[in-house]
């Protein structure tokens, strides 16, 4: 039990950026997505079949490849996400990675166009 208390204390002392990075690392390690878990938990049990027929309303903008203009893509990723230079560079170099999750279709298409204009290959999921 003392180990769990120590772990809770350490997690409580993380900054927001450190907590976000921890979430990304855990998603990669366990092969899950925090956004998907929230969507599944929020879906009603009886309306599962009806929800599958409805059009997708939330999208994840995924950077598939940075292309040849990596610096331009890093600048766009920073502008879109508000990440620092190192975090944006790590995201671009670690492609394929999600840039933004849970966005509306029109915003997702706008972000895709921005990133593609900078030279990136982008997917919407």
UniProtKB/Swiss-Prot annotation:
It holds the Pfam family Ribosomal_L12. The keyword Heme does not apply. Belongs to the bacterial ribosomal protein bL12 family. Transmembrane segments: none annotated. GO terms for cellular component: cytosolic large ribosomal subunit. It comes from Azorhizobium caulinodans (strain ATCC 43989 / DSM 5975 / JCM 20966 / LMG 6465 / NBRC 14845 / NCIMB 13405 / ORS 571). This is Large ribosomal subunit protein bL12. InterPro entries: Ribosomal_bL12, Ribosomal_bL12_C, Ribosomal_bL12_C/ClpS-like, Ribosomal_bL12_oligo, Ribosomal_bL12_oligo_N_sf.
């Amino acid at each position: 039990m003392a180990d769990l208390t120590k772990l809770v204390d350490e997690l409580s002392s993380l900054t927001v950026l450190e907590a976000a990075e921890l979430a990304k690392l855990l998603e990669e390690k366990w092969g899950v997505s925090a956004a998907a878990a929230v969507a599944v938990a929020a879906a009603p049990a009886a309306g599962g079949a009806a929800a599958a027929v409805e059009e997708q309303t939330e999208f994840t903008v995924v950077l598939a490849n940075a292309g040849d203009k990596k610096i331009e893509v890093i600048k766009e990723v920073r502008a879109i996400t508000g990440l620092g230079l190192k975090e944006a560079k790590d995201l671009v170099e670690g492609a394929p990675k999600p840039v933004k999750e849970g966005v509306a279709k029109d915003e997702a298409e706008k972000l895709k166009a921005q990133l593609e204009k900078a030279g990136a290959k982008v997917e919407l999921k």
